[in-house]
Regions:
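Bacterial N-terminal signal peptides that target proteins for export
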Residues: 1-12
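N-terminal signal peptide c-region/cleavage motif recognized by signal peptidases
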Residues: 19-21
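Metalloprotease/metallohydrolase-associated module, dominated by Zn2+-dependent proteases
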Residues: 27-108, 152-195
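Post-HEXXH active-site segment of zinc metalloproteases
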Residues: 108-119, 135-166
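Active-site recognition of the HExxH zinc-binding catalytic motif
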Residues: 123-135
Length: 195
């Protein structure tokens, strides 16, 4: 039933976009991995390295084992008819940068630490993928909101409306990322806990 409702909502959105002359947007995802290196032979050495080298959350000032930064970019074209400005096409670019640990001397680590690390890294990737999916959703929501923009009297008005929608979507999705981290205890409830 949920799938049917989603399909109907998407069909209505597409239908509305086509009736207003807005071409469906292309949404591009660019995913970048930024690895930071850690060394150690056992769990406690690795934990010390994670605690001292992990990426810092700019909002809280705390270090975490991994972090996903994201941003939205957009390009658009508009047309004028009878002195009114209307969006004719747009594209959205979602950039997600995942800051992630790399155990560089894993082959010299003790076997238990290696096994625990592999499970941990798998679960940490899964948690960060959740952030990437939220960022993709933000791109889709921005696209939908831009497709629903009406006509404006000036070029400045349409550009301000686009900027306002982007800021609104970014603010809402930033809160969703914070809620995701709160609900998962920054991935710990998903098994992203070491040791």
């Amino acid at each position: 039933m949920k799938g049917l409702a989603l399909c109907l909502r998407q069909a209505v959105t597409i239908g509305c976009c086509l009736s207003f002359g807005v071409v469906a947007a292309e949404i591009e995802l660019k995913r970048k991995w930024e690895l930071y290196e850690i060394n150690g032979r056992n769990q406690s050495e690795l934990r010390r390295e994670l605690n001292s080298k992990g990426p810092v959350n700019p909002d809280s000032g705390k270090r975490f084992d991994a972090r996903t930064d994201w941003k939205l970019g957009w390009e658009y074209k508009y047309e004028t008819k009878q002195g009114r400005y209307r969006l004719s096409s747009h594209s959205i670019k979602v950039t997600a940068t995942i800051h992630f640990p790399k155990w560089v001397n894993m082959e010299t680590g003790n076997p238990l630490a290696q096994r625990l690390w592999l499970v941990y890294i798998h679960n940490l990737k899964r948690h960060e993928q959740g952030h990437v999916e939220l960022a993709q959703r933000a791109g889709q929501v921005l696209s939908d909101r831009l497709s629903q923009l009406g006509a404006f009297g000036t070029r400045i008005e349409i550009e301000e409306a686009i900027k306002k929608k982007a800021q609104e979507v970014t603010r809402i999705h930033k809160a969703l990322h914070q809620d995701y981290d709160r609900r998962t205890n920054h991935g710990k409830s998903q098994g992203a806990r070491f040791p």
